[in-house]
């Protein structure tokens, strides 16, 4: 079940609540497009939300609701073992990276926690409501692709050590045991 990328949103909306899957409405379609633009698809990432159920009247998540759901998110995190986590939106940012700053200030920056890169991004729904955020969101996803390319690239092969001519000379003929001390 591991995935290199984990995407964490805020809470299920109406469509997500009906279908029981995260990001299936208009914001989900935009998320699919953003993923495709960086060569990823839903089956290559793990998508979830801070809240596991829809807040009444689609209101913002309350702090106590988020706290109640965090053990489930932590369990998902342990199972998935991501290399990068996209933190979508202000509410997810406040729960996952408290105190780092506002989403408008820190989106697109990487924050390393326990060897995992967390990157806050605007929520796709915010970009649907405010089209000026779409370019920022696309650039942030491009940064994730660059990060993954660096992290997942096979390591450069070690250069062959230079062998000194003396080391390649044939050993002495005597069968004498040499001492290490």
State where each predicted segment sits.
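A polyanion-binding, active-site-adjacent surface
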Residues: 1-181
